[in-house]
Amino acid sequence: MFRLHYNKSVKNFTVRRADRSIVCASERRAKIPLIGNTVPLAPSVHIIITRGDFEKAIDKKRPVLSVAVTRFPFVRLLLKRIKEVF
């Protein structure tokens, strides 16, 4: 289980495990992407982060992120974003 955290003082995002160890982090003063972002864990395993997840993290809600086993993570990201909007 992965959660998205937002650090208000540095203005960066971190993906953390259940034991709060950091898996990956964004750069300082990161801008929210239009559609979202994917983080590779292995060659065919990716964490999918939508724009809504980024906005929830800014509101201090720490959303649970989904992990997808796929060769084409951007397609999964698009589908999840479309479901989120509509």
Curated annotation (Swiss-Prot):
Q: What protein name applies here?
A: Protein 1.6
The upper taxonomy is: Viruses, Duplodnaviria, Heunggongvirae, Uroviricota, Caudoviricetes
